[in-house]
Regions:
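Multi-pass alpha-helical transmembrane bundle typical of ion/small-solute transporters
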Residues: 1-222
Length: 222
């Protein structure tokens, strides 16, 4: 078994990538140009026409933000990292950086006949993101070597179950997108509840000597 490496640099790099991703999402919203001499009502109408862009912005920002929190939870469970975790984490970050593209598609085509394709691409990307998180979590928990002693098997299984539920729902959302695009977006948004629970869930640490349960400690608290 190779020596474990400290994860602080990887966490800092990951935080930066998440930050860049959410910044790129807002860049797709353009200030409307109405020309000189037009009254304020024209500008209001132009702003209201941007509602798909703002909707897509909120959806993607909240989703990426909650995923960043879950990423933080995962790494707080680890004593260190190895090459497998580094590669899996790189895949997660690559896919997170791609989120602005389907967000722009939804913003552009949500009210058009091409809405089904745009929403399907949006949901499909999150299938890949979810699958990458599963790979990262399995890489981190395999054999338990990289987990801190206080991380219980129950907590590991809970996170694993949540990830697979999320994957299944994203697959359903992608299929639904071809029939009811708006419903597909709602299904993706409903997953905020699942991911939010995962981000804030507390685990019960084990005593290495007697395996008795102690007080609840949130992994995001350190």
């Amino acid at each position: 078994m190779g020596k474990l490496q400290d994860s602080s640099r990887m966490e800092a790099f990951s935080d930066g990538v998440f930050g860049v991703a959410v910044t790129l999402i807002i860049l797709d919203i353009r200030v409307p140009h109405i020309g000189e001499g037009r009254d304020g009502n024209v500008l209001w109408r132009s702003l209201l026409e941007l509602w798909p862009s703002f909707l897509a912005l909120v959806l993607s920002f909240v989703t990426v933000f909650i995923m960043w929190m879950n990423h933080h939870v995962m790494f707080k469970c680890l004593r260190g990292i190895d090459a497998r975790i580094a590669i899996a984490n790189g895949l997660v970050l690559l896919l997170i950086m791609m989120v602005p593209f389907p967000t722009a598609l939804v913003a552009e085509y949500l009210t058009s006949p091409s809405a089904s394709t745009a929403c399907a691409v949006y949901s499909a990307l999150f299938i890949l993101v979810n699958a990458a998180f599963i790979l990262l979590w399995h890489s981190a928990t395999k054999n338990g070597r990289m987990l801190k002693p206080e991380v219980s098997p129950e907590f590991v299984n809970s996170i694993t179950k949540t990830l697979y539920i999320g994957l299944s729902v994203y697959v359903i959302a992608t299929i639904v997108a071809f029939l009811l695009p708006a419903l597909s977006i709602l299904v993706c948004s409903a997953l905020w509840i699942l991911w939010g629970r995962m981000a804030f869930v507390h685990f019960v640490p084990r005593n290495p000597k007697d395996d008795t349960k102690g007080s609840e400690i949130g992994p995001h608290e350190g």
